[in-house]
Amino acid sequence: MKMIAFAVPILEGKLEDWKQMILGNMLGENKKATDESREYAGVQERSYLQKMSKGHVCILTWEGNDPLSFWLDLMKIALPEFTDHLADLHGRGIFKEENPESMLAEMVYDSKDEQSEILKKDEKTEMIAIALPILPGKIEVWKTKILDKMLGENKPDTDAVRHAAGVRERSFLQETPDGHMVILTFEGKDPVTGYSQIIQKMPSEFAELVMEVHGFDVNAPHPPMPELVYNSHE
């Protein structure tokens, strides 16, 4: 199964308008039709609401055999009709009618292992998603000191930590008008506990890099997890 991801900021003062327009439609009387459209396309859509240091962000994921085709078809309908409404909620420059694929985050890491035990069990899993902005001027530090190490000689160890925690991690990099953002997804029987185990096993030098690049102190009390506000399979 393939996954695509996309994170959009919600402008200050627009949270209630966003809830009314987006969630009101998707969770209200249109939910059955919305769910069925995703099922017909063979994708599972999830939406998460995350509180940031300033404002909120909505994280969206689509998973299936061909989620990109569904996304492109969806944008052909949504952007011409709702461009102004979306810009009012999320800001200009986020939604690109001329090239919708360029809006999506790029998957840069996947801990999947065909031998992994969590992939062998035919059981219900859950997924969490987290957005981490990259601080201004820190994108190259993130690429060379975090991502390259995760994908290079440390990848077997990086994967093993995820497998031991019982989760599959997929990481995405998204460019936004305000900079870059990393989207992390963790899927498993208990992804919250798995994520906590990964944080606890993080080497001190890596934790320092996370602080430098994201301004996120892994040793401090963690903020509430993003809330799953829509799941087309529920």
Report the location of each language-model feature.
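Short glycine-enriched loop/turn motifs at secondary-structure junctions
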Residues: 1-3, 53-54, 124-126, 178
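Short amphipathic alpha-helical segments
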Residues: 14-41, 138-166
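Hydrophobic pocket/interface hotspot
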Residues: 18, 60, 130, 142, ...
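An amphipathic, aromatic/His-enriched active-site/gating alpha helix that lines ligand/cofactor pockets
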Residues: 31-44, 63-101, 155-168, 187-224
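N-terminal secretory/targeting leader peptides
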Residues: 46-50, 56, 169-174, 178-180
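Surface-exposed beta-loop interaction hotspot
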Residues: 106-127
